[in-house]
Amino acid sequence: MFSRRIQVLSPFLKHFVNRNARMMATEANISATSANPQSQGENLKTFEIYRWNPEKPEVKPKLQKYTVDLTKCGPMVLDALIKIKNEQDPTLTFRRSCREGICGSCAMNINGSNTLACICNIKKDNKPTKIYPLPHCFIVKDLVPDLTYFYKQYKSIEPWLQNDNIPKDKEFYQSRADRAKLDGLYECILCACCSTSCPSYWWNSEEYLGPAVLMQAYRWIIDSRDQATAKRLDVMQNSMSVYRCHTIMNCARTCPKGLNPGLAIAKVKALMATA
């Protein structure tokens, strides 16, 4: 049991270690700049950020340029966004919370790829960093996408344990082998990076569940403690919910957690074929 706890806790410990390393790197960077005043102001980076305000519908969306001195900024894109909002433009709107790649709030499109701003390093080159909201979503404002329908689809798969045979000690036991089957699935943080990078989801988002939701569906389908496997598969037995996946695999390439939704979808298809 102790070894299992260590395995469960290790991802969280890893995040704290990474956070401390980033903080130390930032402090070292600022200290080096203070020790060498001539270097101040020489490491400027341009950010081109998508702006749109629903309160001003007559103004078309645009890319607005901001310049940040990287010697006085943390190493991540989110650090730059926070610095811009705090020091240059308080109207800039974006989501963020944990700053550790855990919550998924700061998902956006950076230089053409969906990712989390809090774990995306600022490129040390002369090219501007272009930042857009997640693609093919309605926009609330600036970098904030409307994920209402995404979460509605997630709710539709009933992502909770369904088992009416509650044990006397009120705990559902699971072997280590069965628990290991959930690795690579439960870590999904529902940031929507994968689904909004999928062309099939762009074209069929009203009916196709998309990579993130389907991976979560598979996570519950194979959970040895769950008794609703047949029902879960039956709900998706149509031409759209699952089979609009054409294995383009953008989902696996863009996942900031290194997961493989495409593989999970393939396994769902295999189960449906034999159900």
Curated annotation (Swiss-Prot):
Residues 1-24 form a transit peptide. GO terms for molecular function: 2 iron, 2 sulfur cluster binding; 3 iron, 4 sulfur cluster binding; 4 iron, 4 sulfur cluster binding; electron transfer activity; metal ion binding; succinate dehydrogenase (quinone) activity. Pfam families: Fer2_3, Fer4_17. The keyword Iron applies. Residues 178-208 form the 4Fe-4S ferredoxin-type domain. PROSITE patterns: 2FE2S_FER_1, 2FE2S_FER_2, 4FE4S_FER_1, 4FE4S_FER_2. InterPro entries: 2Fe-2S_ferredoxin-like_sf, 2Fe-2S_ferredoxin-type, 2Fe2S_fd_BS, 4Fe4S_Fe-S-bd, 4Fe4S_Fe_S_CS, Beta-grasp_dom_sf, Helical_ferredxn, SDH/FRD_Iron-Sulfur. It is found in: Mitochondrion inner membrane. It is a peripheral membrane protein. Its cofactor is [2Fe-2S] cluster; [3Fe-4S] cluster; [4Fe-4S] cluster. Residues 57-137 form the 2Fe-2S ferredoxin-type domain. One of its GO terms (cellular component) is mitochondrial membrane. Pathway: Carbohydrate metabolism; tricarboxylic acid cycle; fumarate from succinate (eukaryal route): step 1/1. Binds 1 [2Fe-2S] cluster. Binds 1 [3Fe-4S] cluster. It is an enzyme of class 1 (oxidoreductase). [2Fe-2S] cluster binds at C98, C103, C106, C118. The keyword Magnesium does not apply. It catalyses: a quinone + succinate = fumarate + a quinol. GO terms for biological process: aerobic respiration; mitochondrial electron transport, succinate to ubiquinone; respiratory electron transport chain; tricarboxylic acid cycle. Component of complex II composed of four subunits: a flavoprotein (FP), an iron-sulfur protein (IP), and a cytochrome b composed of a large and a small subunit. NCBIfam families: dhsB, PRK05950.1. PANTHER family: SUCCINATE DEHYDROGENASE [UBIQUINONE] IRON-SULFUR SUBUNIT, MITOCHONDRIAL, SUCCINATE DEHYDROGENASE IRON-SULFUR PROTEIN. Belongs to the succinate dehydrogenase/fumarate reductase iron-sulfur protein family. Iron-sulfur protein (IP) subunit of succinate dehydrogenase (SDH) that is involved in complex II of the mitochondrial electron transport chain and is responsible for transferring electrons from succinate to ubiquinone (coenzyme Q). This is Succinate dehydrogenase [ubiquinone] iron-sulfur subunit, mitochondrial. It comes from Schizosaccharomyces pombe (strain 972 / ATCC 24843) (Fission yeast).
